[in-house]
Amino acid sequence: MIILTKLNGEKFMLNPDLIEIVTENPDTVITTSTGHSYIVEQSMNEILSLIKEYRLSVRRQRLE
């Protein structure tokens, strides 16, 4: 799970495997495969980094 922040400051966790589309114009909007949309403070690049970190941690756990 990755931790994101809504524009109102509320933090929430999202399963990155559910992310279908991320747009940035100018607000960053995440749309999931379930049809939910979230407007977040993080940039598209920050979200990409969070997803990469999450996937690396999952792979490390499998190797242990």
Task: Describe the role of every protein-language-model region.
Residues 1-13, 17-64:
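Eukaryotic intrinsically disordered, low-complexity regulatory linkers and tails enriched in Ser/Thr/Pro
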